[in-house]
UniProtKB/Swiss-Prot annotation:
Reaction equations catalysed: iminosuccinate + dihydroxyacetone phosphate = quinolinate + phosphate + 2 H2O + H(+)
Species of origin: Herpetosiphon aurantiacus (strain ATCC 23779 / DSM 785 / 114-95)
Name of the molecule in the record: Quinolinate synthase
Protein origin, superkingdom: Bacteria
Record note on cofactor: Binds 1 [4Fe-4S] cluster per subunit.
Principal subcellular localisation of the protein: cytoplasm
Pathway listed: Cofactor biosynthesis; NAD(+) biosynthesis; quinolinate from iminoaspartate: step 1/1
Taxonomic path: Bacteria, Bacillati, Chloroflexota, Chloroflexia, Herpetosiphonales
Length: 375
């Protein structure tokens, strides 16, 4: 379990009272002042799904893969991560011992990461041992970075690696070449899309593993025949997109380009013209010709920012409803200002500190990912 400084939880109530009444102009000025005082001792990392009034203060912005690389390379003493819990954990795992990682809101979690806990994973591995004789020799565990530090540690200890939506293809290919089977968790949709669309593994060689059922809900024979075991997890945002939404856009605008994130269901990715990570989505649309129209299947803050940054194009969400990552949205300018001004005063609040034993094993999985992906 990740350790959060106990005093940060109590101080949070004071933060709400002290900062809630400030205008956005006051907050912007105070954040800028705090950043100037901290100088090179500080780096603020901002995920693409953060709201505009937070991400504008980031020194570096990116997707989970890019920010993992940034966290590994930065020389700053303080890493303030405007993202969600598992991202801050990864920054702490990859960072130096003398670096401090801070998450402005310690309740900013990830429902997908919560769908795979370490106790369930250990039970699943025991079942695979029972069925296959030696899970270690037969199954390569691969975890999406959207997972807890404890899950990453388990994967690292058992020879596996992490992946992101940017590098899932080379990681899954690596796993396939080393062991006859792989266990991909916690996002079944990214695993299925990568294995099927990128590596050509037949869908009938994949099983969705329900960790709440014995043997994942399958017979031992079916498990022995399978090549890819997909953990029954998903992203609550990307699961909201539907193939019917894409068809509706095409009926209204036959010229529309559809680009979606691989966390969407296979039905959605099959209907799209382009599929890729947030970094891929941004690059593709930024480089698209003026006058083009795009329907984007990812979190609404990024979709809106793409339209703002590309006024010569028409950019809409695939969904008729706002698909918002509510946990990303928990981080606001008030909390960012609070943690920065505390740092100026020499106080560290909301530190994310992964226990050493977990950190060492989890680093194996993250370092393997970076090595395989070329960073």
């Amino acid at each position: 379990m990740t350790v959060i400084a106990a005093e940060a939880i109590g101080v949070a109530h004071e933060r709400a009272e002290d900062y809630a009444g400030l205008s956005i102009e006051e907050l912007d000025q105070r954040i800028a002042t705090a950043k100037a005082k901290l100088g090179e001792r500080l780096v603020i990392l901002g995920h693409h799904y953060q709201r505009d009034d937070v991400v504008k203060h980031a020194d570096l912005s990116g997707d989970s893969y890019g920010l993992s690389v940034d966290a590994r390379k930065t020389a700053a003493e303080y890493i303030v991560f405007c993202g969600v819990h598992f991202m801050a954990e990864s920054a702490d795992i990859l960072g130096r011992d003398d670096q401090t990682v801070i998450l402005p809101d310690h309740t900013a979690g990830c429902s997908m990461a919560d769908m795979a806990d370490i106790e369930q994973l250990e039970e699943v591995w025991d079942e695979l041992d029972e069925i296959l004789g030696d899970a270690e020799a037969q199954v390569m565990p691969i975890t999406y970075v959207n997972s807890s530090a404890a899950v990453k540690a388990f994967v690292g200890e058992h020879g596996g690696a992490c992946c992101t939506s940017s590098n899932a293809e080379p990681i899954v290919r690596w796993a396939k070449n080393l062991r006859p089977k792989m266990l991909f968790l916690p996002d079944q949709h990214l695993g299925r899309y990568t294995a099927f669309a990128k590596l050509g593994i037949p869908l009938d060689k994949m099983l969705v593993w329900n960790p709440n059922l014995r043997y994942g809900g399958h017979t031992p024979e079916a498990i022995r025949e399978a090549e890819v075991l997909l953990w029954a997890g998903h992203c609550s945002v990307h699961a909201q997109f539907r193939p019917a939404y894409i068809k509706a856009w095409r009926e209204k605008h036959p010229e529309i380009n559809v680009i979606v994130h691989p966390e969407c269901t296979l039905g959605v990715t099959n209907e799209a013209d382009y599929v890729g990570s947030t970094a891929y989505i941004i690059k593709t649309i930024n480089e698209a010709p003026a006058g083009s129209m795009w329907a984007v299947g990812t979190e609404i803050n990024l979709v809106n920012r793409l339209q703002t940054n590309n006024p010569d194009k028409t950019i809409v969400s695939v969904s008729p409803f706002a698909c918002l990552c509510s946990t990303m949205y928990r981080i606001d300018p008030e909390e960012l200002c609070w943690v920065l001004e505390n740092l100026v005063e020499g106080n560290v609040v909301n530190q994310i500190a992964v226990p050493t034993a977990i950190k060492q094993k989890a680093r194996l999985a993250l370092e393997r990912m970076l090595e395989i992906a070329g960073n």
